[in-house]
């Protein structure tokens, strides 16, 4: 957007176009601008928004992380609405992951694979899982990462609000139920450096959660989400309800989704199983704002 080059004290309305438009035949059109007296303006990002839904929630979060300078595996977005584009860093691995990107986040519902498969057949299969006419905004072709450790983390306003969880190897099992706290000091140290860097952007991003992979040298960010409900200990979402209904991790994520659909307003969820707060189970409960806590067995 080279032609949108205004000082900070200007308000600018513009549009971005895949084809060249306007009298200057460019990809950006400026519709209106006006100058204001210079003053401090608080800038805060929030998504889902119209653009994140345009390319898919997961793709949008990774673009934000890449823009802010974090290690994001080299990613090509194959979207419905725009031509393919690539961002991120080379991981040194030539294997390709393929990841579906729903319009809005639906934790653990759609396919992520660590090897390439027919993307056209995949889209047909995954669309059938959704409840709308169109559920998938894009697919990601992503450079693989050598996963020595993987997991999730929540980055709060200060370190006392932080949460780190993970497992050895790939994070698929962790996100859908397997839980292990014993990460090495080296991994925790690397994670804390990355989390503090995210915290330096707190005014812009607010409280965020990440999915991460450690390859022995670097922490790679494979998902970035904003969260509205901060978890604490075994509590996923705080709230005052008259009773809690049991939901078992062993029954899977779809069972939890079905239970939420029929849950009374004055009822919460007791999630039973060895699962992490930053797992997809926790994501689903936070996203639906269901008062909930974990009972580990």
Q: Over which residues does each language-model region extend?
A:
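Nucleotide/phosphate-binding sheet-loop regions of phosphoryl- and nucleotidyl-transfer enzymes
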Residues: 1-297
């Amino acid at each position: 957007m080279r032609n949108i080059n205004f000082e900070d004290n200007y308000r600018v309305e513009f549009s971005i176009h895949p084809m060249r438009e306007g009298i200057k035949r460019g990809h950006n059109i400026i519709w209106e601008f006006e100058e204001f007296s210079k003053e401090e303006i608080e800038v805060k990002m929030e998504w889902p928004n119209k653009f994140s839904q345009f390319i898919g929630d997961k793709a949008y979060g990774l673009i934000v992380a890449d823009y802010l300078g974090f290690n994001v595996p080299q990613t090509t977005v194959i979207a419905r609405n725009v031509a393919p584009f690539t961002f991120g860093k080379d991981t040194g691995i030539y294997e390709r992951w393929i990841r579906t990107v729903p319009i809005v986040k639906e934790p653990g519902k759609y396919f992520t694979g660590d090897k390439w498969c027919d993307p056209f057949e995949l889209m047909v299969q995954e669309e059938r899982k959704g409840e709308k006419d169109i559920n998938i905004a894009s697919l990601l072709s992503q450079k693989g990462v050598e996963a020595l450790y993987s997991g999730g983390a929540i980055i709060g306003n200060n370190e006392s609000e932080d949460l780190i969880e993970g497992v050895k190897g790939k994070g698929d099992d962790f996100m859908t139920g397997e839980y292990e706290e014993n990460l090495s000091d080296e991994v925790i140290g690397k994670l804390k450096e990355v989390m503090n860097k995210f915290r330096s952007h707190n005014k812009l991003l607010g409280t965020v959660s990440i999915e991460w992979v450690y390859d022995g040298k670097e922490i790679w960010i494979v998902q970035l989400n904003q969260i509205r409900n901060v978890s604490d200990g075994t509590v996923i979402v705080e709230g005052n309800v008259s009773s809690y209904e049991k939901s078992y991790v062993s029954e899977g994520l779809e069972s939890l989704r079905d239970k939420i659909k029929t849950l009374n307003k004055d009822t919460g969820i007791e999630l039973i199983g060895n699962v992490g707060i930053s797992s997809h189970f926790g994501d689903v409960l936070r996203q639906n704002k269901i008062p909930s806590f974990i009972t580990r067995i």
